[in-house]
Amino acid sequence: MDKQRAVHVYKVLAACLAAALVLGACASTARRVAVPYAISFTADAQVNPDANGRPSPIQITVYELKSASTFKARDYFALQSNPQAALGAELLNTDQIILQPGQTEVIKHAGNVDAGAIGIVASYRDLEDSQWRLTVPLPEAENTNIYKFWQFSPNEQTVQIAVNRSGLAVTGWDRPWWPF
């Protein structure tokens, strides 16, 4: 009877060890998880007026950045002509859209653990009298918990950007209250 009991104990231990290895193999090794985000642009009906005062389409360029300091120090033409040279290692990603007057457009990103801010440039006809540049801090990457099999992905956060007649402005953030 003792021999059967010992065999049973070894089988249970082997099953527990196998389960631990399977769960460990499925676990994520990442210590931080990027927070996905969306940028909702809403163009004013009178955006980017031409010489006759008529609204015109406007090009928007979004730069995903490690930090905003280098972006803030560059001029419009350096950012538009060669962003990689102007921003160097600070630049992680770029997106471009063209908004019609009154149009709303959403850009979605999975997030990046290295990203700390986004820089937004609007190609206004009158750069001198417009706020053509805007920086928005991004949510920090979330630390993972020790129970990797119980890990939830962070919820998407949305920033609303108004593309006004002569400038860019943050009008709000949608941060979900539910943690998963």
Q: Which residues are covered by each model-predicted region?
A:
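C-terminal motif of bacterial Sec signal peptides marking the signal peptidase cleavage site
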Residues: V22-A25
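Glycine-rich, aromatic-bearing surface loops/beta-hairpins
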Residues: R133-F180
